[in-house]
């Protein structure tokens, strides 16, 4: 009985101490939300759509405020100028990633491009990826992979159209996206395996078998594990961590097989793809590590690239189709632009296809994609950072170890006119205005006493900003254009019942719409 009483007193004291700690206000601290509860902090304020609920809190609490996500003190940044200060000007003070248990469980300790801390290795890995993307030969390979996979996808859609079968957007876009990333990662091996998005093997081929564990990882990471934020609950979530490890292990084994084959054909003087660049780096710069350690490091690096590039593109493609279905006039305007660009080169004797070289001539479609990325930012709260040291931002003190979340969704909604209206023309007007100002050699004038308001390039940051932004922006943009352009060129897309689709969000690593099927009407 005495032991039970002692435990009771201990719990009461712990709850009181935790409540005082989380509600204590210091003079120069970032303003903190009131009513942080013991143990859970402000988690109860997040709801099903954290990015939307946090954005609502901005109106009352300002563009920077802090809250407690369980045990983790977190600063939410929605003010674009403060966001630039953190992500660009004081980048080195906010360059590391938080050590969340789920992410460590998945990454094997955080050794990869996304979750690795900003140490001596990260800039090198970043340079490997970015330089490989910009090399002429590799760029040519990337574009070839994207166009080939687009053609395969369009052919599959033609089959659906001919037999009047609903096209399941989530399944096919997910497979397309992973096929692109894998093709870029190790092109030659994928050429030999002939990654195909066709109807005969969509549920049984090796790529689909890889897609399933990847989507499982996205589900487990994206839905949020409360034990990441409340440490005392971790013993009760061992099964969740085990599931995450199992899914990540399946991806690792798939890539291990490709790595072993890849290594046999590796030629240092003639790197073929991104995996070759990782191999070259590890074998050149890690002379004291074993072959097994080198292999693990290379595969983990490749895995990070796959996980970084897969879900966001697939989610954006789903949203583009949803908005085009719900806005048929915009869909037809895109089609007319494509026809105009193709001109006499497009006739009935040829398969309809628009190549990536035409991208710069399709500005309206590019603006449609940008508007989708604005209104449905795939990573609405970006990837979290932590403060690496005590520092000051905008007169506020931020303590070392504080987690930082950049509210990309909030910036693209609170700093534009009519944020909930899907309007690609806003981008056309914006760029016309910028061009006029450049011609007149004028500085942009403040709008509504805020020089960020309606400055779309500075408030719409779907791929983040600064030195640690998304390294694969150019690849993602090419992916999105290639698929969107060729779907619109070949099909009129509608909902199955002819009604508007519901734009309800499903939270995960990226924000998806609820799964929907598409009715494809061939434009031929």
From Swiss-Prot:
Membrane topology type: Single-pass membrane protein
Q: Which GO terms describe its cellular component?
A: membrane
Tell me the enzyme class.
oxidoreductase
| Residues annotated for heme binding in this entry | 470
Q: Which GO terms describe its molecular function?
A: heme binding; iron ion binding; monooxygenase activity; oxidoreductase activity, acting on paired donors, with incorporation or reduction of molecular oxygen
- Indicate yes or no for the key word Protein biosynthesis: no
* InterPro entries named in the record: Cyt_P450, Cyt_P450_CS, Cyt_P450_E_grp-I, Cyt_P450_sf
Query: Where is this protein primarily located?
Result: membrane
* Enzyme Commission number(s) of this protein: 1.14.-.-
The protein's required cofactor(s) are namely:
heme
The alphabetical list of record keywords is:
Heme, Iron, Membrane, Metal-binding, Monooxygenase, Oxidoreductase, Transmembrane, Transmembrane helix
PROSITE patterns according to UniProt: CYTOCHROME_P450
Indicate the transmembrane segments per the record: 1-21
Write out the annotated subcellular location.
Answer: Membrane
Q: Which PANTHER family match?
A: CYTOCHROME P450 307A1-RELATED, HEME-BINDING MONOOXYGENASE FAMILY
The record's similarity note reads:
Belongs to the cytochrome P450 family.
- Protein name (record): Probable cytochrome P450 519C1
Taxonomy-wise, where does this protein's organism fall, top ranks first?
Eukaryota, Amoebozoa, Evosea, Eumycetozoa, Dictyostelia
